[in-house]
Amino acid sequence: MAGAGERKGKKDDNGIGTAIDFVLSNARLVLGVGGAAMLGIATLAVKRMYDRAISAPTSPTRLSHSGKRSWEEPNWMGSPRLLNRDMKTGLSRSLQTLPTDSSAFDTDTFCPPRPKPLARRGQVDLKKSRLRMSLQEKLLSYYRNRAAIPAGEQARAKQAAVDICAELRSFLRAKLPDMPLRDMYLSGSLYDDLQVVTADHIQLIVPLVLEQNLWSCIPGEDTIMNIPGFFLVRRENPEYFPRGSSYWDRCVVGGYLSPKTVADTFEKVVAGSINWPAIGSLLDYVIRPAPPPEALTLEVQYERDKHLVIDFLPSVTLGDTVLVARPHRLAQYDNLWRLSLRPAETARLRALDQADSGCRSLCLKILKAICKSTPALGHLTASQLTNVILHLSQEEADWSPDMLADRFLQALRGLISYLEAGVLPSALNPKVNLFAELTPHEIDELGYTLYCSLSEPEVLLQT
């Protein structure tokens, strides 16, 4: 850091570099090793922010030698977006609120402090306990007042989804009796009691019946596209079973079952063939298909001020592989089926909590509510947050309710580490990178927002 200050001083010595070098050189005596390290990181960030704000960026964005992003040294060089007032305020607040006692920092992150007298150590432990309990109380209050959905609201939303599912099932059996489908079923966070803030979304899984000898699935990593977590569904044995042998041959594009064509087939049924106003009047709901591009979505008003979105999700099962017609973010991969991991992730999370009466699901709900209420964190999905909790469960055994605050902070730090690397491996299938569909700009924004909240995590609960 001193070297960085010297190089900058040669270019534009305005006195700030000298002051910062003096502060850093004496910080260790006042704050200890841990405090000096954190103060150094934050001070360097402010100094570089100031330097870059007064000189237009000219060089391309740089990564660290390890190839990882770092929000201790923000990745703004070459960005077309100039530093705004919110960024400066965020970094200034982080610097001002840093603890002045090195014992407040994680001793696993920095060099261990010198041994302290027992009385002093007891006071520090008591202080840390009070701080932890304060955050614990705020997390529980946030969950009760902001994240938790009243049981009555959940029940009414589920009942509306069940009623509509029954009507759609009856219609398909009557109008399209030759369409090979298994029974439709409801899925999603509302069904699994993991939805937060409002009961406003649920999925209706529509399983297709495929002949096992006519279809096979090819992992995305084995194709020229090299995309783990996605599959091609290939039509097999056309020489023995010509086109038309399977009902779903009509949805084959280039020798592969196209999820987009399957979705278009259901769109004609959902949006074009069913008289939803009449069904809505019968059920005392207001039902209408969502406008494009959300073609396979129904918008339901089941009470005066309560709305529910129902997504129709075609699904195929080949052997042990379950795929859903949820498209890749990039249109060029619209012929790929997505591997369905959410049911297994949810089942593992629930099993872990049931085994030790843990707080994993509670921690997940709080994180989901924060992301849902914070626009800057809107790109984080429930699956990504679930996998952060599952990875943390492999590292930490104690998930008792009184450890909620500690585990919450660890989850934030872990999430920042995954964003720095640009990789979040699936806990169930490590080949799958759950950040693969995020752009570098989105990853930087998420990492910056979370990093600025580390020194004052309560800010996340005020959104």
Curated annotation (Swiss-Prot):
**What superkingdom does the record give?**
Eukaryota
Q: Where in the cell is it found?
A: Mitochondrion outer membrane
Which GO BP terms, alphabetically?
cellular response to hypoxia; mitochondrial fission; mitochondrial large ribosomal subunit assembly; mitochondrial respiratory chain complex I assembly; positive regulation of mitochondrial fission; positive regulation of mitochondrial fusion; positive regulation of mitochondrial translation; positive regulation of protein targeting to membrane
- What membrane topology does this protein have? Single-pass membrane protein
Q: Which spans are transmembrane here? A: 24-46
Q: Which InterPro entries match?
A: Mab-21_HhH/H2TH-like (IPR046906), MAB21L/cGLR (IPR024810), MID49/MID51 (IPR045909), MID51-like_C (IPR049097)
What protein name applies here? Answer: Mitochondrial dynamics protein MID51
| Organism of provenance | Rattus norvegicus
